[in-house]
Amino acid sequence: MPPKKPEPKKEAAKPAAAPAPAASAAPEPLKDSAFDPKSVKIDFSADQIEEFKEAFSLFDRTPTGEMKITYGQCGDVLRALGQNPTNAEVLRVLGKPKPEEMSSKTLDFEMFLPILQHISRNKEQGTYEDFVEGLRVFDKESNGTVMGAELRHVLATLGEKMSEAEVEQLLSGQEDANGCINYEAFVKHIMSG
């Protein structure tokens, strides 16, 4: 009988607790699931906006220079402006378009600016410990190193894939004579520059 008494208390507590998390959790899914460009306050200076507009215009492929880019170009423009969003972040702020819409749907500069502001404010950067922990998975001998060839393969084929040139630039000068990379020193190097 003692186990039965806590169960009704838990059930009684759950309905009381459920409304509180539901109320506090409601805004979070809206934030993650739908990006509302109208809710973004633009904090850029006039000079910055002019610079962004100039970069945006370089990606405009419309025949009459309508200042529009395809959804597929949005991530490229953001990266050209110094941001580093993941493809998933770009898709989320675009409203999760279908693959075929990436080349057919367009957005103008006025629609792009709130996206840029949102991405620039919400940079999710990992910590030193996060990166070291992630690389430790590949440390088969538990000696603080990973094989350069394996890291090259992972960077070029998994997640946000990097080009071979990007991988080579990133790993340049990091391998020892055995082709191993001290990943703690590597992470410090990456995070310092």
Curated annotation (Swiss-Prot):
UniProt KW RNA-binding keyword: no
CDD domains: EFh
GO molecular function: calcium ion binding
Protein name as annotated: Myosin light chain 4
Amino acid composition bias (Low complexity), ranges on this chain: 14-28
Entry keyword annotation includes Repeat: yes
This protein's GO CC annotations: myosin complex
